Amino acid sequence: MRLFRCCAAAVVAAESLLWLKNGSPFFAFLPGNGEIADNCSGNPCGGTAAGTCINTPSGYDCRCEPGYVLGVENDQVTCMMPSGVPMANFVQLSETPAACSSNPCGPEAAGTCKETNSGYICRCNQGYRISLDGTGNVTCIVRQESGCEENGCGPPDAVQSCRRLTGTAGRLCVCKENFIATIDASAHITCKRVPPHYRKPPFEFGKGGHPVDSEPSKRQREDEGESREPESDSTEPGRDQERRTPLEESQEPEGSTPDSQQSRGGSGSDSTESEEQGKEREEGSGHAGAIAGGVIGGLLLLSAAGAGVAYMRKSGSGGGEEIEYERGIEAAEASEVEVLVDLDSKTWD
């Protein structure tokens, strides 16, 4: 029996030397009672990182991974580095931390991290999006909702583009032709079809319709004033002469011409006013009431002064002076002065 064991050990040693020399698979034949034992327990081949252990009827077989060779350590066949360092020890020394160990994608609520051969990838949860952190690594950050993802600007047939404003939760809506941006009570902007009472202006800064102005703008009024011909003086000749009071006629020297006739005589040569005078008259129309009031006050003051002069002439009759009256006018009428003002006349300009 002892002789048999010695012969078996010699055969194993010889086959080991032949395998190391030729690189052929190694099989160990060990004595036993015929039962198949788990010869791979304890990872005799150095672990799954170094090689794979396969049970055989006579022992185990080591299939080493690339970069490792079969060797003998502590009288046991195993997979080891060519330099003689065991695979298990080498893996322990060269092992690096996993890419997802530092949670580069953020907390669990933000997303999950999955390791790859070249690094990791982040799968962000709802409400988060992919972004780069301060070190240039990919991570998941909170998504700033702008509403563009859910047709926040309106239906697709009404919206030309929807863009999220950087750094805010707002959005920029650009409506298509025949649509206009509207805002509701919640300050939400949407594109809706242009109502019938809307139209496009002569010039536009973008797409969509605009409301029609109920009143012409100042620019339009100026343009209409330039294109319209100036109106001629519609005052009838001799109208001021008919409105003059007897007292005013009595105080005028003979042969003099009324100021109104002189002014009309000077303006009669020009049938139309210049464009600048037309603008000034249009701009000054708002002050016509104030000017008319001032003129009326001035006329009342003049009438009071005329009445005072007439009174002084009357009172001077006691001194032997005669009161002069206008021919054809009674004394009672001369003491009462009536002032007539034509507010519709344009002579006050």
Curated annotation (Swiss-Prot):
Annotated stretches, region: Disordered: 194-291
Region entry Acidic domain, spans: 204-283
Highest taxon listed in the record's lineage: Eukaryota
SMART domains: EGF, EGF_CA
Cystines in this chain: C40-C53, C45-C62, C64-C79, C100-C113, C105-C122, C124-C140, C148-C162, C153-C173, C175-C191
Subunit structure: Interacts directly with MIC1. Part of the MIC6-MIC1-MIC4 complex.
Domain characteristics, as noted in the entry: The EGF-like domains 2 and 3 and part of the acidic domain interact with the galectin-like domain of MIC1. The presence of at least one of the EGF-like domains, EGF-like domain 2 or EGF-like domain 3, is required for targeting of MIC1 and MIC4 into the microneme.
PTM comment text: Subject to proteolytic processing involving both the N-terminus and the C-terminus. The first EGF-like domain (EGF-like domain 1) is removed by proteolytic cleavage by ASP3 and is not present in the mature protein. Released as soluble 35 kDa protein after proteolytic processing at the C-terminus.
Entry annotated with the keyword Disulfide bond: yes
Gene3D superfamilies for the chain: Laminin
SUPFAM superfamilies associated with the record: EGF/Laminin, Growth factor receptor domain
Gene assigned in the entry: MIC6
Membrane disposition: Single-pass type I membrane protein
Subcellular location: Cytoplasmic vesicle, Secretory vesicle, Microneme membrane; Secreted
Organism of provenance: Toxoplasma gondii
Descriptive protein name: Micronemal protein 6
Segments traversing the membrane: 290-310
Signal peptide boundaries: 1-23
Alphabetical UniProt keywords: Cell adhesion, Cytoplasmic vesicle, Disulfide bond, EGF-like domain, Membrane, Repeat, Secreted, Signal, Transmembrane, Transmembrane helix, Virulence
InterPro entries (alphabetical): EGF-like_Ca-bd_dom (IPR001881), EGF-like_CS (IPR013032), EGF-like_dom (IPR000742), EGF-type_Asp/Asn_hydroxyl_site (IPR000152), Growth_fac_rcpt_cys_sf (IPR009030)
